Amino acid sequence: VKNWLLKFFSLLRYLLPKNIGNRFLIVSTTGLGDTLWGTPAIRALRKTYPGAYIGVLTTPLGKEVLKNNPHIDEFFVLRHLPIFSLLALLSHLRRRRIAKIFIFHTSQRPILPFCTWLGASHIVATAGINKGLDSLLTQPMPAKRQHEIQRRLEIVGCFGDVSMEIFPSSASPLQETSPPIPVVGLHPGAKDLFKQWPPSHFIALGNRLKDHLGCHIVVTGGPEEKELVTKIVRGIEGAKAMTAPLSISDLAALIQQMALLVTNDTGPMHIACAVKTPALALFCPTDPILCGPYHVPKSRILQKPITCTPCLKKKCRDPFCMRQIGIEDAFQNSLALFYG
């Protein structure tokens, strides 16, 4: 059945009338960091084709990350995957006469077959990461060991500045103090457990930074990380928790106010890079060459080698490899970033 469906969609790609012109659709339906990685490519595409139409197919989270981005003409939001939702989206998108589709990253397997119905002359994506559907691409790009930002720039075929963009809210999430007291942020969570530095290490680091710098400690986290954030705040006298319902633009404004953010490999790390806040990024099982801070002067990567071969990744329930990152090492690197 799978092979029959692939042949059907491949044939459909050739039978449908093809749209032409500079009418582009970006597909990015994964996480916060994945979405931010696409902003340099979107900006470069706009600079190369200033009069083009640029639409973005994304998730509600992705739309929030890209909110107020001046290079995007229109959003198409993928809220659910039932067939009627895709049919409604299909109707809207076909009316836009999309000529070229750039698939940055998608976790939803039906998206690529869906794209074949849009009448685009070109469907471009990196080969090997499309859940066995590479045959539906008109222009498969070779997979390389390169940063995700660079991969997206190559997909759109443009060159440009690699700095990410996000547009923080104008409201200040933290009250100003007089005299000003620096704010140091800790982000102890991550989508996957195997990327998390131990809570006890964050507590010890937060206390040392507070005592040494005389700073305020703010601990950030998503709605599912409230218990983790609360645990760390309780371990650091005077620390403040900042969790949901912060919007992405409010979180960006908060991180922009920080003198430093110490973070696991997760979305807020990329926000810090986008708003130019000094960031200490803690890495072990993931590869910073692919997904770490990229050409960001005010950032440092603190990395240790993996301890399991192969890495268990999402199956890991005790990320002891992350314990290799010592508190003293994190403290000294934090001071170096803070004093700049």
Predicted regions and their residues:
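Catalytic machinery of carbohydrate-active enzymes
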Residues: 1-340
